[in-house]
Amino acid sequence: MENGSVIRILDDCASYVIIADEAVAPTSELPSHLSVHNDLLSKNSPYKASVHTHPIELIALTHCKKFLEKDVATNMLWSMIPETKAFCPRGLGIIPYKLPSSVELAEATIKELQDYDVVMWEKHGVFAVDCDAMQAFDQIDVLNKSALIYIAAKNMGFEPDGMSQEQMKEMTVAFNLPK
């Protein structure tokens, strides 16, 4: 991995070693990662991985106030393709702008992860948790594909219809999804 960092926290819980093939320094968001992991451990969560990245299309949505309202972006993204609801059934939490690398951002992330597995940091990026890094990444990837479909339709000059609420409810029942 050339542009990602994988670390192992040492037994003293105060230091770490980089275990990836390429020695890439950890993200400046390490405080958020560690705070979230501590929270997950304290709750005996099955989630062991977190991913923070900067998907362009999802970040672009945060520059539109309507998508910062609770579950507006979630419902729009779910409606673009069925896979989005199936791969990201808890939706996309939204965290209003906080200073990057701040304790406030870490605390807001922990709070929002009570209801969502993926959270959007306004005008910054996305943070996801799951059982492993690939599953966390897959959630981000499918959400970003939905954002790309939405933006492509808008660029073609029309508002995409998306799946209806009835169709999304049918998926929830058929696949036994939480929301």
Task: Cite the ranges covered by each PLM segment.
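Glycine-rich flexible loops
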Residues: 1-179
